Amino acid sequence: MKKVILAFIYIVSLCLVGAQDNDQTVLRTWYMTPKDGKQKQLEKGLADHVAKFHGQGSWPELHFDVLSGPNAGSLRGFSGPHAWKAFDDRVRSQADIDHYNKYVLPYSDNKNNSIDFWVFAPKLSYNPAPSTLYHFSYNYIVPGSDAEYVEFLEGFKKSKELSKSLVSHKIYKTVSGKNPDTWVWVYPISNMEELSGSTQLVGGGGSMASTLGEKETKRLNQIYQKVVKSRMREIIKFRPDLSTPGVMNN
């Protein structure tokens, strides 16, 4: 019964954090790693493919260089933000498929070919802002603990609101992919020096205590330590030459 109740709370929580007037909240994302010695060929083929089949006003694709983490040296691709229905309605042309198979796929290592879907949680995010450089923090949580983790996220956001923090962040939930028990913090940064503001997820307990009090801060940190199994962080940098123009502000 307890598990049923927790599952119900989790589903309701996702509905609440995902609901907004604009239903374009879904990102499709993937990694693309060049085969040894084939980086130039991959990037040339991808640039040509995006220009031909993902231009402004068409199905958008954005690519980023991965600068840190286990996938450093790869490209990180995104399509979106979309409504779920857009994936049902999309029909790829045969020319699109053939061009990709001929000029992109032969130069890409397929060992890391998972495709994930992320959903933006606006009610858990704080002052989202566009950038061309991002710091991602992946929180891998215990299965079935989403409701508790959402409670932590709500408290953390409240602390930032009360302190009028200058560090903005977006929250995404992985709803399908390699690890569906993943929540992603997305920090926009202007330069590497700004990493200092996005590397204190729970280490910023002092600022939380000043706004929420010692007791509530301790409770939230205990939730975090209980439900988060591990983390991974990566820095990504926008590649306009490999991306659909005019969609970065989304």
Residue ranges and their predicted role:
Residues 1-24:
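Bacterial Sec-dependent N-terminal signal peptides
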